[in-house]
């Protein structure tokens, strides 16, 4: 996907911390894997896929190369400290939807990095033909739900016993959506 938005570039977070934003490339597999493996177990508990596995990150990189996924990495000192991805199935009946995934290192939380990364995705989404962003969480991810609500998402559904965590425990899935047109202008 050729994007108009300029990358790489440096942004300042709310506390003045500078991070470099750039697009993930297939050669970033080991950096992303190192980031994923540094996350606390609770952060990994309900991810749709296990990003601590090499094969999973390699498939992610293949989706980037094929144009199905765009991932914005946040780096400091060449280490990944967060990312936001939008996954887009261009041929299904949901081709107007993009799935948002955001992950931020604990040391960079409460600084606005998740919000910055989310805004990047909303700025990119129209260039991909995406009209609506979908986010999936579990009901106990209260901070994440509050963050996406503040960003303009609304809850569409709660699907009970819909996901199984890494330890085999079932939980619900909260489905939240936001129209891209409503937020794309504020992401510029």
Task: Report residues per predicted region.
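Conserved catalytic-core motifs of GNAT/GCN5-like acyltransferases
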Residues: 134-137, 145, 149-171
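Glycine-rich phosphate/pyrophosphate-binding loop shared by adenosine-nucleotide-utilizing enzymes
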Residues: 17-19, 77-83, 171
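Acetyl-CoA-dependent GNAT
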Residues: 49-96, 101-105, 118, 179-181
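Conserved GNAT acetyl-CoA-binding A-motif
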Residues: 118, 125-137
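Conserved acetyl-CoA pyrophosphate-binding loop and the N-cap/start of the following alpha-helix
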Residues: 108, 112-120
């Amino acid at each position: 996907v050729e994007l108009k938005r300029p990358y790489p570039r440096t942004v300042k977070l709310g506390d003045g911390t500078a991070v470099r934003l750039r697009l993930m490339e297939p050669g970033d597999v080991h950096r992303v894997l190192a980031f994923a493996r540094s996350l606390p177990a609770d952060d990994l508990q309900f991810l749709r896929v296990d990003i601590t596995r090499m094969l999973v990150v390699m498939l992610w990189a293949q989706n980037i190369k094929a144009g199905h996924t765009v991932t914005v990495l946040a780096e400091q000192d060449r280490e990944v400290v967060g990312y936001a991805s939008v996954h887009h199935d261009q041929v299904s009946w949901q081709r107007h939807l993009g799935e948002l995934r955001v992950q931020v290192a604990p040391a960079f939380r409460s600084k606005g990095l998740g919000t910055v990364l989310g805004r990047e995705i909303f700025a990119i989404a129209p260039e991909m033909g995406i009209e609506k962003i979908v986010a999936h969480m579990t009901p106990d991810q209260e901070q994440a739900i509050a963050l996406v609500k503040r960003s303009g998402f609304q809850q569409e559904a709660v699907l009970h016993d819909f996901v199984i965590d890494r330890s085999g425990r079932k939980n619900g899935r909260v489905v939240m959506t936001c129209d891209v047109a409503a937020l794309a202008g504020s992401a510029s």
